[in-house]
Structures are given as C-alpha cells and as structure tokens.
A protein has these predicted regions:
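Flexible, acidic/histidine-containing loops and adjacent segments that form or flank the divalent-metal
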Residues: 21-33, 39, 79, 90-106, ...
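Mature, Sec-exported extracytoplasmic domains of Gram-positive
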Residues: 48-50, 60, 83-86, 90, ...
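Short active-site segment of divalent metal-dependent hydrolases/proteases
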Residues: 114
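Ser/Thr-glycine-rich phosphate-binding loops at phosphate-binding pockets of nucleotides
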Residues: 110-111
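Zn-dependent metallo-beta-lactamase
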Residues: 19-56, 60-77
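Alpha-helical transmembrane segments and their juxtamembrane interfaces
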Residues: 12-13, 68, 121
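Positively charged n-region of N-terminal signal peptides that target proteins for export
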Residues: 1-4
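Bacterial N-terminal signal peptides
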Residues: 6-15
Length: 178
C-alpha cells in the first residue's frame, strides 16, 4: 500500500508541471509550426514554414450538418461565433510577427467536401456576391496569396458533373469567391 501511495504522489507531482493551457511559443526563423485548428466543425491546418512562408490547408464548415451539439463541443463557449471567425482569429493571432501578417501565403484545398471547404447548409449571405461558409467566410477576414486546388479553372476532372456532386450547391459559391 505504501508503494501505491508513493507512485500516486509521484504522479501528482509530475502532473503539476504539465499545463495543457500554456500558450505556444512564438514562431522563430528556422522553426516549422503545424497547427491543427480545432474549430469542431471541419478541417483546417495552418503551417508556418522555416522561412516564414505560411499555408492554410482546408477550411471546412459543417456546423449545421448535425443537430447534435456534442459533435461540435468547441462551439459551446459562444455559439454565435462562426467557424470562419474562429479560424481567422487563430491565424491572425499566430501571424502577428510574420512577413505576411494579414493572411496565409498559400491556401491548399485538398478536396471539395464540406468539412474541408464549407457547404450550402448553414451558409450565410455575403456582401460580395457569394455565400459564406468555410473558406469563403475565412476569406472575409484574411488575405490569401495564392490558391491551390485540384481543377482550376474548369473543375471538369473527372467531369464537371462529378465535381459538382461532391458538394452540391457550394462549388458555384467557391468559384465566385475565387
């Protein structure tokens, strides 16, 4: 029993030195930071490369796709804030001291699913002629250098109909945004 108490005491002391809420140190030249942004309703990764070049990979939003709030626990603190706002706020916070603080140098869209780019369900009206969800909403807050996706400018591989079927209704919004 004494041994169990000793082990327990050791683990308590060890855990005191581990703090999950510590802020990440600022990026430094030569470092590579890879941030998976946990917005709870889609995929988004922000990369700061050793030379300060930045890239965002995907910016999805499927907030309205599920009625179960347990699927998106990160929205419990303020359900009025959107995925786009959360992503932009995070990126701007970590970009303050970078060569291009207003937004990533590159945006890479891996594929045309809602959890990677946004979707019609839950889309907000935009003032620039396209709906806001996922990447189109993030683009309201951040300035991007170059976009990379599969299919620009025709989006016809394997066929236009097939590409449109990947994310019904949102591809026209994405094209207008670009």
């Amino acid at each position: 029993m004494k041994r169990i108490y000793s082990i327990f005491f050791f683990l308590v002391l060890l855990s005191a030195s581990i703090r999950a809420q510590d802020t990440l140190p600022a990026w430094q030249k030569g470092w590579m930071d890879i941030h998976t942004i946990a917005v709870g309703a889609g995929e988004c990764t922000f990369v700061i490369m050793p030379d300060g070049t930045t890239m965002m990979i995907d910016a999805g939003d499927v907030t309205k796709a599920s009625k179960d709030p347990h699927n998106y626990p990160n929205f419990m603190d303020d359900p009025n804030r959107t995925v786009g706002e959360r992503i932009a706020e995070y990126v701007l916070d970590f970009s303050k001291d970078l060569p291009r603080p207003a937004g990533p140098d590159y945006f890479l869209l891996t594929h045309f699913h809602g959890d990677h780019m946004g979707q019609v369900k839950g889309m907000l009206p935009g003032a620039n002629g396209y709906g806001l969800s996922g990447i189109t909403q993030v683009g309201e807050y951040l300035s991007f250098g170059k976009f990379v996706d599969r299919g620009w400018p025709d989006y016809d591989e394997p066929s236009r109909e097939r590409v449109e079927s990947f994310n019904k209704g949102f591809m026209p919004e994405y094209r207008k945004f670009l």
